[in-house]
Design a protein with these regions (language model features):
Chain B
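Cytoplasmic juxtamembrane regions at transmembrane-helix boundaries
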Residues: 111-124, 251, 259, 450-460
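Short phosphate-coordinating micro-motif centered on Lys-Gly-acidic
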Residues: 149
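Transmembrane helix-loop-helix hairpins at membrane boundaries of multipass inner-membrane proteins
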Residues: 1-11, 23-123, 198, 202-206, ...
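Hydrophobic transmembrane alpha-helices and their helix-loop junctions in integral membrane proteins
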Residues: 106-114, 130-142, 155-442
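Cytoplasmic/organellar membrane-interface segments at the starts of transmembrane helices
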Residues: 379-381, 435-503
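Hydrophobic alpha-helical membrane-insertion segments
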Residues: 48-62, 178-189, 392, 428, ...
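Alpha-helical transmembrane segments and their helix-start/interface "positive-inside/aromatic belt" motifs
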Residues: 38-51, 169-179, 379-382, 459-467
Length: 685, 503
């Protein structure tokens, strides 16, 4: 047991959370805010040097072990802080975004009566996430995994009076648990096959016995395939991948800073982190890796199509997150773990920026989230607008590819996203070509929905009717049309004379985090690309994730230019529909395809029918038929009923005549004696 | 110090509560009628005796050497008919005794609101504690049986007299179910004594290891014991007495029922079935696994549909006990350790959940879920406590609910992965019913005007919960402390089982 700065990074937020949470009645909101923010600040200040030492220094991976968590017959987990380039990357991502979100929340949550509780949850989340990324075995990973899950549950349902928030929180937790079902089985199988759950032991055993089989009877698979597959099921839940994505959009019920921190920058990327951490397993498991690729690519495209048709500003960004996570996964699936991690890194900046920017707009418009009721926000909120445009450019991956001797130049997303699309093109892994085309198509849609969001929110005339009625549906129950009729009236009365929105720019405590994140969105790519992806990648990663450097050079020009081309195309399309000819957008929104996309391919309806109603029906069946009719009916109640029946009839035997009784006794004695002799009871042994 | 070590600590722990009961009885006889303040004095006296029992059990714990093999603190006095008054503990029984003595004072605190015949209630509770502790330290089969069955009677009366509206039905159902199983066990006990010519449990274990019961006989003996323990635990399909008993029982009786009486079933499997009938245990493992998996899925889904808070938690107990049997009958070290851990953790968490129900029941006199809603608005501290134990029930890592679950599954996985795949769905279902319950009771706005004046936890309730909160978190974050302690017993059971399976 030793104490060190690395331990403080992880445990500091826990103590701050406990302090703020347990003593909130006595210390008040202000002190709770200061304590939690300061502790994250300390973690931040301690994390960056560690990370930069991997980037520019010559740090080696190291491990700090605290004490045994569980140790039963080789099933051993130790509370650890593992530091290598992978966890160091996550440390700076988590602490940076968390710190900025803490600061931002000072402004965003200023009116909330439960600020101390909010900051306590935020810090607890940060602790769990840090414990997750610094784990040295699968069980601590699982601990952090569930810890961030419960923090997410608490924060989505932070406004506990709202039924929709509570339902979203439960949905998030349960969907994640479906993933954890796979994760837990993966841990068990890893222990069963490799007799350990420590990363190094598992990876080296898997590498030493790559063809170890697992199965019963005719069902036999390679163990490493099965372990990788099961672990990925966990990642699908946490990172909201296709089939298990349904919770993420609903998670937007939480306060916006939470969406930025948990449901964009950090927690949802835990699945990507896990796949990269276990890259040495997926490396050996082409089928599982192919599955990762296909699911990731499908998610990237699917979520982008749904994002196109959403009206709630946060939901658009949420689907965008889902889609970008898909990119990260198919990058990992095709073996480009470094590209996946780099996209995770850059995405954290620009997606947190977009969420906090959206939060600023929502704040400025007094909690209006429906883009149909926005418009004309640029003028009253110029800084927010500028930051959102930077975020948008970074998200769509704007940049000029390398031409001849000139290196490419662009915003953060350009470096990471193009690297992913190119890796998919060059890979000959299962599903890689599918992933490439999904990636390119999704890039087109990303550009379209991002600009749609920017135009609908900031440009044109204000369409809202502030304070008039709040009975309108918030996206979820609303109609599929981008311009609901109910809001047609009265907006001119509320909009300012020049058509701009009656909004106010957010306070500086909210804007400064935006500016910092915008700086990251602009520069994170150009500064760190050489270390994550380029010439210094070997030195940076030091074998923590498998690298495939041999791809360079074989890339056709059209592949290099494809992302930029589709991005510009998406931009132009958005300009046409949402700036020049808004009537066309309304016409588009009346079509059945739009309704299909708006309703998210009807996943919620299908799941509700199968799982929710199914569970209720089976539960009732087991209870009312199984327990009450069959088990109790045949068991105790049946016995009771029949004994009542017999006792009624036996009563007739109670005649009251002594000789009847004595006669019965005689018969019984004879019968018993006969049985004893027959059975040999009492005979000498 | 060495003189202290030789005191008969187990006897003291076991019968100290009875001494308290006698004292109350004596006071009652002397007082001849109810004097003002009598009930209050009885409560305090009972609390003092149960706390003293806990302290003495800590002394016994201190005198116990977890590194030494076999049974310790042994007391063996010849008794009637050749049966011995024979007590002893290993680390398994030591932890269960500690669980019992730890929870009983909290139950007494939770019974403060009992107004009806306080003295009788407390006397029964004290006797019940003696019988429960006795079960775990009895080292003679007949003595074990007496304690095991004796526990039925006070519980029967507690439910039947202090229970809810359908208390008589519930009490009889409870009594008949458990008695039926026990009679079969009695027959098996007689048979075992006849075969092995001893009623001493350590001798029987040694006999099983060195001579061994005939495999064909083992089958019957195993089944007879199984009938008793399966009802007690309870396993599917003999579980339906539990929800009824819980619903009707007063809060503290529910706590004891869930936390300790159920554990006697698991204890029995570990003490008798596995080490004494290893080949039969091995033979029946698929059946036990199947019943466990059915219990987990079935009870979870049924719990999801309950409208009564206690019934929901009772069904969740059935599901959690499924993990216990899964772990125990894997026969692996991880599984047995997981089973033991799950029993301890369930003792604390389900006990605490029943106390949580008791808190609002005391205020509103209903357990109907639909009656509540939005409690967090009026009772934030209660809501936080309830949240913690809900998460424990869900098996969240960091609470005591997690290590037992994962270890049981890891152990069982090594025997049969397919059953474990099915059982692991329990981690999904537990979240479904537990979080739904929490939402319906604690979250949202207060819709029911009757809840408008409901008050948060008072000092007594807070004192009741704090030890449970601390235990849940310590057992969740540093389970290796407990696991290290129980490893000796778990290892010897696993060894005995493994030795008997492969002759």
């Amino acid at each position: 047991m030793q104490f060190s700065p690395e331990v403080l990074i992880v445990l500091g937020p826990l103590f701050a959370a406990a302090f703020a949470g347990l003593l909130q009645r006595y210390i008040g909101d202000r002190i709770a805010q200061i304590i939690t923010t300061a502790s994250i600040g300390v973690s931040l200040a301690l994390s960056w040097p560690i990370f930069l030492n991997f980037v520019w220094g010559d740090a080696h991976p190291y491990l700090i072990e605290l004490f045994k968590f569980i140790d039963v017959g080789g099933f051993t987990s130790t509370w650890s802080v593992r530091i290598d380039s992978l966890s160091a990357t996550m440390l700076v991502v988590v602490t940076t975004v968390s710190f900025l979100v803490h600061v931002y929340s000072w402004g965003y949550m200023a009116e909330d009566p439960h600020r101390a509780r909010f900051f306590s949850y935020l810090s607890f989340f940060t602790f769990a996430m840090l414990a997750l990324v610094t784990a040295n075995d699968l069980l601590q990973l699982f601990f952090g995994w569930e810890g961030v899950g419960v923090a997410s549950y608490l924060l989505i349902g932070f406004w506990y009076q709202k039924r929709s928030a509570n339902d979203a929180a439960i949905k998030a937790f349960i969907t994640n648990r479906v993933g954890d079902f796979g994760f837990a089985l993966g841990i068990m199988l890893a222990f069963f096959c490799y007799h350990s759950i420590r990363y190094e032991d598992v990876f080296s055993a898997a590498a030493a016995h790559p063809n170890l089989m697992f199965g019963i009877g005719a069902f036999q698979v390679r163990a490493v395939e099965a372990v990788s597959f099961l672990l990925f099921i966990g990642a699908m839940g946490k990172s909201a991948q296709f089939f298990l994505h349904v919770w993420l959009p609903d998670a937007m019920e939480g306060p916006t800073p939470v969406s930025a921190l948990i449901h964009a920058a950090t927690m949802v990327t835990a699945g990507v982190f896990m796949v990269c951490r276990c890259g040495e397993l997926f490396q050996l498991a082409p089928m599982a890796a192919g599955f990762v690729t296909v699911i990731g690519a499908t998610t990237a495209l699917f979520a982008a199509t749904v994002g196109v048709a959403q009206n709630d500003i946060k939901r658009v960004v949420a689907y965008s997150t889902c889609s970008q996570l898909g990119y990260m996964f198919f990058a990992a699936g095709v073996g480009a773990y470094n590209a996946a991690m780099f996209h995770l890194f850059t995405h954290a900046f620009f997606k947190a920026l977009l969420f906090l920017g959206a939060g600023s707009v929502i704040h400025g418009l007094h909690h209006e989230q429906d883009m149909r009721n926005m418009g004309g926000v640029r003028k009253p909120m110029p800084i927010t607008w500028a930051m959102m445009i930077i975020g948008t450019l970074a998200l769509i991956g704007f940049g000029i590819p390398a031409i001849g001797p000139f290196p490419g130049l662009g915003l953060a997303g350009f470096y990471s996203k193009d690297a992913i699309i190119e890796s998919a093109f060059l890979s000959n892994g299962t599903g890689a070509q599918f992933a490439f085309w999904c990636g390119v198509s999704a890039a087109f849609l990303t550009s379209f929905y991002s600009w749609r969001l920017a135009f609908m929110t900031f440009e044109g005339a204000y369409r809202g009717s502030h304070g008039a009625d709040h009975a309108h549906g918030h996206g979820k129950e609303g109609t599929a049309e981008p311009d609901a009729h109910s809001h047609g009236h009265g907006y001119e009365a509320h909009a300012k004379a020049d058509g701009s929105a009656p909004a106010h720019e957010s306070p500086w405590v909210m804007l400064v985090p935006l500016v910092v994140l915008a700086a990251g969105a602009v520069f994170a790519g150009i500064i760190f690309a050489p270390y994550f992806l380029g010439v210094h990648a070997e030195a940076f990663w030091r074998g923590v994730v498998p690298l495939h450097g041999e791809h360079e050079g074989a890339l056709p020009t059209w592949v290099t230019w494809a992302p930029l081309t589709v991005t510009v195309a998406g931009f132009l399309l958005a300009v046409i529909f949402y700036l020049w000819n808004t009537g066309a957008a309304k016409a588009l929104a009346k079509g059945p395809l739009w309704a299909f996309l708006y309703n998210k391919w009807y996943f919620d309806e299908i799941y509700d029918f199968i799982f929710v109603k199914g569970a209720r029906a089976i539960g009732d069946l087991f209870w009312k038929v199984g327990d009450q009719k069959i088990i109790d009916g045949l068991g105790p109640d049946g016995v009771a009923a029949s004994s009542r029946f017999f006792s009624r009839n036996l009563r007739k035997l109670q005649t009251g005549f002594v000789y009847h009784y004595s006669f019965l006794m005689l018969i019984a004695a004879v019968a018993f004696g006969a049985y004893a002799i027959w059975a040999g009871i009492g005979a000498p042994r | 110090m060495s003189d202290l070590m030789h005191l008969p600590w187990l006897t003291i722990v076991t019968f100290l509560p009875t001494a308290g009961a006698l004292l109350i009885l004596l006071a009652r006889v002397l007082a001849r009628g109810v004097e003002p303040g009598y009930d209050a004095a009885v409560r305090v006296l009972t609390l003092i005796f149960t706390i003293a029992t806990f302290l003495v059990s800590l002394v016994a714990f201190a005198a116990f050497d977890s590194n030494a093999p076999g049974f310790q603190l042994v007391e063996n006095v010849a008794w009637a008919f050749g049966f011995g008054y024979h007590l002893g503990v290993d680390s398994l029984s030591m932890t269960l005794i500690l669980l019992t003595t730890f929870l009983t004072p909290l139950c007494i605190l939770a019974s403060w609101s009992i107004q009806k015949q306080v003295a009788s209630y407390m006397i029964l509770f004290l006797i019940l504690e003696t019988l429960m502790i006795g079960v775990f330290c009895a080292m003679d089969l007949v003595l074990f049986y007496l304690f095991f069955e004796g526990g039925l009677i006070p519980m029967f009366i507690l439910i039947g007299v202090w229970g809810g509206q359908r208390r008589v039905y519930a009490a009889f159902k409870f009594f008949l179910y458990t008695l039926l199983g026990s009679i079969l066990m009695l027959v098996a006990i007689v048979a075992m004594i006849n075969i092995a010519h001893t009623s001493s449990i350590p001798d029987l274990i040694a006999y099983a290891q060195h001579v061994g019961f005939d495999p064909n006989v083992q089958i019957w003996l195993w089944l007879a014991f199984f009938a008793s323990f399966a009802v007690k635990l309870p396993m599917w399909p003999v579980h339906t007495w539990l929800p009824d008993a819980h619903v009707e029982a007063p809060t503290a009786a529910s706590v004891v029922l869930a936390a300790i009486l159920l554990k006697m079933g698991g204890y029995g499997f570990l003490r008798f079935s596995l080490p004494m009938f290893p080949s039969a245990s091995h033979f029946f493992t698929p059946m036990v696994f199947a019943l466990s998996v059915i219990a987990i899925i079935w009870a979870s889904l049924v719990a999801f549909r309950q409208a009564d808070m206690k019934k929901l938690i009772a069904y969740s107990s059935v599901a959690h006990m499924g993990f216990v049997t899964l772990g125990i009958f894997s026969g692996t070290l991880q599984g047995i350790q997981g089973g033991i851990y799950q029993m301890l953790s369930h003792g604390i968490i389900s006990g605490a959940l029943f106390l949580c129900v008791g808190v609002v029941y005391d205020r509103m006199h209903t357990r109907e879920i639909a009656f509540y809603g939005g409690l967090v608005n009026r009772m934030p501290v209660y809501a936080a406590v309830f949240m913690l134990f809900t998460m424990g029930n869900v098996g969240l890592p960091g609470t005591s609910g997690f290590p037992g679950e994962i270890l049981s599954l890891v152990g069982a996985f090594q025997v049969n992965a397919w059953f474990v795949v099915a059982a692991t769905t329990g981690v999904i279902f537990s979240a479904v019913y537990a979080l739904t319950l929490y939402r319906k009771v604690a979250l949202g706005n207060i819709e029911n005007p009757k809840l408008g004046g409901i008050l948060d936890l008072d000092g007594r309730e807070w004192v009741t919960f704090v030890p449970l909160i601390v235990a849940t978190l310590i057992m969740g974050l540093a389970p290796s402390i407990v696991l290290h302690f129980t490893e000796g017993a778990a290892q010897s059971i696993a060894t005995a089982y493994a030795g008997g399976v492969t002759p």
